[in-house]
From Swiss-Prot:
The protein's name in its UniProt record: Succinate--CoA ligase [ADP-forming] subunit beta
Source taxonomy: Bacteria, Bacillati, Actinomycetota, Actinomycetes, Micrococcales
Family of the protein in this entry: Belongs to the succinate/malate CoA ligase beta subunit family.
Gene (name only): sucC
GO cellular component, one term: succinate-CoA ligase complex
Example GO biological process: tricarboxylic acid cycle
Keyword annotations from UniProtKB, A to Z: ATP-binding, Ligase, Magnesium, Metal-binding, Nucleotide-binding, Tricarboxylic acid cycle
Length: 387
């Protein structure tokens, strides 16, 4: 789960990372009040879960409350890479002498953690990695040993920090790692980490991604989820405990097992090239227990997507036999009734497949078409979606 900047800032403050004062606001009037409370020069920053805000007018400096209110009027409602700004943070200003970069993230390839650090912060890290890879220090972090003062000092020196700053930035690195470890994050990033003209080291902007698989250890993280901004279909699927990701196509996909669903997406995309370029509309993995209720919940989510024109149900019977899946589909269609109004192509294979096909054939539902192979099913679903 990606956090907004203000949420990351609050976590930083919790762990003792030096940050500027900040107040969240939803209206220009609230922004004015926040600027009056903070006093001095402030920065009004769009709260969206994407980068590049400053390049499109999502970050504005305000010298007084009037300017802060006007900045909010310009920023609120702004579309930044598909993210509509509904909230801003009014942050205190800082006189910046230098900008740095620091992050710690999950290194999946090496089954470890990795710190990325540079004395050239402020620019996008992807751009820095391409244009000046030598300016980015990559230091592995042992998940058991973590980042203590000794390790943080090693990181700071490897990145080329001036010796007089090493102890200061090392202290901040330790605290940022504490955020990473303590909150079960997969990414903690500060860009920029700044040195002010007064000699302070401050996290000026922050990005945090939390591991949702560790949510059982952090019930408080549920409060960080922005349900209002979530895709309504994804929110509905989450309530039903379904593994669903919305895409931009026209063929709804239901399968059991992430590998099979991913393969189905590829086959449907390939078939769509022959049928007006239609594409998969979603990823939906119903898992091993394809009960009537689970199937109904999955179909309910997909059929409520106005972009979906057809649905491809692709199931390989294993622990859950194909006859149980077929009964689930029939009962799901009964449960949904008139809400089931788009054609379904069903491909079953594996355990008890013949009985599963017989059940669907005997049901003779007008919306259901049986396919013997995945390729055949994908082609038929793409054809129906293209009509």
């Amino acid at each position: 789960m990606d956090l907004y900047e203000y949420q990351a800032r609050d976590l930083f403050e919790k762990y003792g990372v030096p940050v500027l004062p900040g107040i969240v606001a939803d209206t220009p009037e609230e922004v004015r009040a926040a600027a009056e409370k903070l006093g001095g020069v402030n920065v009004v920053k769009a709260q969206v879960k994407t980068g590049g805000r400053g390049k499109v007018g999502g970050v504005k400096v305000a010298k007084n409350p009037d300017e802060a209110e006007e900045a909010a009027k310009a920023i609120l409602g702004l579309d930044i890479k598909g993210h509509v700004v509904r909230r801003v943070m009014v942050s205190g200003g800082a006189r910046i002498a230098r900008e740095f970069y620091f992050s710690v993230l999950l290194d999946r390839a090496n089954r470890s953690y990795l710190s990325l650090t540079s004395v050239e912060g402020g620019m996008e890290i992807e751009q820095l990695a391409v244009e000046k890879p030598e300016a980015l220090a990559r230091i592995g972090v042992d998940p058991i040993a973590g980042v203590d003062t000794t390790k943080a000092t090693e990181i700071a020196r490897a990145a080329g920090f001036p010796e007089e700053l090493v102890s200061k930035v090392a202290d901040v690195f330790v605290k940022l790692y504490d955020v990473y470890k303590g909150e079960d994050a997969t990414l903690v990033e500060v860009n920029p980490l700044v040195l002010t003209e007064e000699g302070e080291v401050i996290a000026l902007d922050g990005k945090v991604t939390l591991d949702e698989n560790a949510g059982f250890r952090h019930p408080e993280h549920e409060e960080l989820e922005d349900k209002a901004a979530a895709d309504p279909l994804e929110a509905k699927a989450k309530e039903a405990d379904l593994n669903y990701v919305k895409l931009d196509g026209q063929v709804g996909i239901i399968g059991n097992g992430a590998g099979l669903v991913m393969s189905t997406l590829d086959v449907v995309a390939y078939a769509g090239e022959r049928h007006k370029g239609v594409k998969p509309a979603n990823f939906l993995d119903i898992g091993g227990g394809a009960s009537a209720e689970v199937m109904a919940a999955g179909l309910d989510v997909i059929l409520n997507d106005p972009q979906v024109k057809s649905v491809f149900v692709n199931v390989f019977g294993g622990i859950t036999a194909c006859d149980a899946v077929a009964n689930g589909i029939v009962k799901a269609l009964e449960i949904l009734g008139g809400d089931a109004n788009k054609p379904l192509v069903v491909r079953l294979d594996g355990n008890n497949v013949e009985e599963g096909r017989r059940i669907l054939t005997d049901a003779n539902h007008p919306l259901v078409t049986l396919a013997l192979t995945m390729d055949e099913g994908a082609d038929k679903a793409a054809e129906l979606a293209a009509k």
